[in-house]
Amino acid sequence: MRESTWVSLLLLLLLPAPQRGGPQDGRGSPEPEPERGPLQPFDLLYASGVAAYYSGDYEGAVRDLEAALRSHRRLRDIRTRCARHCAARRPLAPPGAGPGAELPFFRAVLERARCSRSCQSQRLGGPASRHRVSEDVRSDFQRRVPYNYLQRAYIKLNQLDKAMEAAHTFFMANPEHMEMQQNIEDYKATARVEAPLVDREAKPHLESYNAGVKHYEADDFEAAIKYFEQALREYFNEDMVCRALCEGPQRFEEYEYLGSKGSLYEAIADHYMQVLVCQHECVRELATRPGRLSPIENFLPLHYDYLQFAYYRVGEYVKALECAKAYLMFHPDDQDVLDNVDFYESLLDDSTDPASIEAREDLTAFVKRHKLEAELIKSAAEGLGFSYSEPNYWISYGGRQDENRVPSGVNMDGAEVHGLSMGKKSPPKIGRDLREGGPLLYENITFVYNSEQLNGTQRVLLDNVLSEEQCRELHSVASGIMLVGDGYRGKTSPHTPNEKFEGATVLKALKFGYEGRVPLKSARLFYDISEKARKIVESYFMLNSTLYFSYTHMVCRTALSGQQDRRNDLSHPIHADNCLLDPEANECWKEPPAYTFRDYSALLYMNDDFEGGEFIFTEMDAKTVTASIKPKCGRMISFSSGGENPHGVKAVTRGQRCAVALWFTLDPLYRELERIQADEVIAILDQEQHGKHGLNINPKDEL
């Protein structure tokens, strides 16, 4: 690591944390209170609750799921409190001079590590390693999936009020879940409830901010000030929590930690930079509402923008000036607020020097640290060779749209634009020439619709890609090779609890065929028809470069009996294949965990003896359907994989729907590994077959 980067790292580590509202992180910070008995790991309680639900033990399901949620909250609280406690008790010492200059610093690091381990083990009632969970479980809790099971279990127990509360909590983080929305309406109608529903996982800083905006718009400025100030205290507290949680274990993408050949400082840098980037992006996390991908634009600065005028309206000009100057720390060139500053200064008594009024103290240290983090990350990216693009966390499109944007007495020219993105954005552009209408290559294939007829971009619908006999053969082999949850990280019902998902890859099919567990001819058909589909897509869209397989998957989804009444959820929610669809912002974010390297997609259907299961395209709002396609044997829909083609699958309400799903890439670096292995298996099989024909053995000679 370069000298300047190492020095910056030390400076950042030694920079005192911004002061918070509430308890301070001083030397006298009290130790977290010990737990009564060992804390049970929330992932085990969650698994037990789900198992109880599916076995019909609804009381047990409620008991374990509620315990899992309590354990999850308590674990988060313990980690945060221990981080605060150890930061106060074991401050990092600055390096000295001369031989062993770095030893005081690393000694302090080791002491803090020991403090953290001891604190967590004592409060958890055992080693912290017991509470490390899989990405799937972490994702379920982030998406509030336990509340989905809870609302169903509470309904079975005739506890309507608790079911309604759990359903609302789940829906707030999953606003696209139509079934849950309908459940809530049904619960309200049955219980005749008029009071607002409670979100059990509501973020206090967002709730207070929303309340502040509501009072501000009603010209109740005293109440608005109360809630905005409360929102800021809660924001800074939540920022501290977020940063503490970033200090947990990190993933090392380029190497396994124990097998690393990197030096001491490379290992330190790798881990610390991941922690630092996580902490730096807490501002995005705190500005993002549950279930949304994009943050509220200009979120933190808007608190001070609202406050500066609210304080002006109640006659507190010094505080108005402090808040206006705080806002300028984010947007120093905002002419409206610069004018406000001049206006507020003109209202001060003669005894007050305007130059002595500085920006809010609660923000100064926060912004200083944020800027230092940005400089360090940029420096490290250049010196250590990793890529990082600094987001514009405080983006603003002109402020708020209201008559109170500028105080009376200050010139107002032109209309203001609301700070939040409300308008519908145009679909994202594809970074290559768009063409279609190339040859279909094979006889008997029937062209059905093109992009224009399907009301979109880069779309095509074809029939007779498979014959009836091939469909039957593929359906038959599917029953012999498919495994529940295959391709979905073992999840039986990854998208909806009302259907069972089974899948298999080409390589698995060939392996089963080679072992004689399914007919080799049928396994080979799976391989051959996927290659046929690839050639058709490459030819029809007139691509100038080779189209490679990114992932090939045979999948069947089966409607579960007894769970189809009043269904209005989707078998597969609306999404895009290479970006994260954000319907509220009308955006599709091309960033992990999306498969950003995918360029084209295709679905080849094998049957139509089921109900529901229509494939649908929508606008980027994930609601407006632009095309609906009924699957049948031999039908293939293909389209470009980006945000220009949001799509999903309607609920399968009876029977089993089977298809071959194919994703393609134009980048050879992202070729499907199993496909390359399958190519090698096919080459061996072809060679063996050729050898048999070449020898031309007379069966009588074998006697």
Swiss-Prot record:
Keywords: Dioxygenase, Endoplasmic reticulum, Glycoprotein, Golgi apparatus, Iron, Metal-binding, Oxidoreductase, Repeat, Sarcoplasmic reticulum, Signal, TPR repeat, Vitamin C. It comes from the Eukaryota. Glycans are attached at residues 444, 455, 544. GO terms for cellular component: basement membrane; cytosol; endoplasmic reticulum; Golgi apparatus; nucleoplasm; sarcoplasmic reticulum. The active site is at 657. The keyword Transport does not apply. Residues 552-666 form the Fe2OG dioxygenase domain. GO terms for molecular function: iron ion binding; L-ascorbic acid binding; procollagen-proline 3-dioxygenase activity. Its EC number is 1.14.11.7. It is an enzyme of class 1 (oxidoreductase). A motif (Prevents secretion from ER) lies at residues 700-703. Detected at low levels in cartilage. Residues 18-40 are annotated as: Disordered. TPR repeats lie at residues 42-75, 144-177, 205-238, 301-334. It holds the Pfam family 2OG-FeII_Oxy_3. It catalyses: L-prolyl-[collagen] + 2-oxoglutarate + O2 = trans-3-hydroxy-L-prolyl-[collagen] + succinate + CO2. Fe cation binds at residues 575, 577, 647. GO terms for biological process: collagen metabolic process; negative regulation of cell population proliferation; peptidyl-proline hydroxylation. Its main location: endoplasmic reticulum. It is found in: Endoplasmic reticulum; Sarcoplasmic reticulum; Golgi apparatus. Belongs to the leprecan family. Prolyl 3-hydroxylase that catalyzes the post-translational formation of 3-hydroxyproline on collagens. Contributes to proline 3-hydroxylation of collagen COL4A1 and COL1A1 in tendons, the eye sclera and in the eye lens capsule. Has high activity with the type IV collagen COL4A1, and lower activity with COL1A1. Catalyzes hydroxylation of the first Pro in Gly-Pro-Hyp sequences where Hyp is 4-hydroxyproline. Has no activity on substrates that lack 4-hydroxyproline in the third position. This is Prolyl 3-hydroxylase 2. It comes from Rattus norvegicus (Rat). The lineage of its organism: Eukaryota, Metazoa, Chordata, Craniata, Vertebrata.
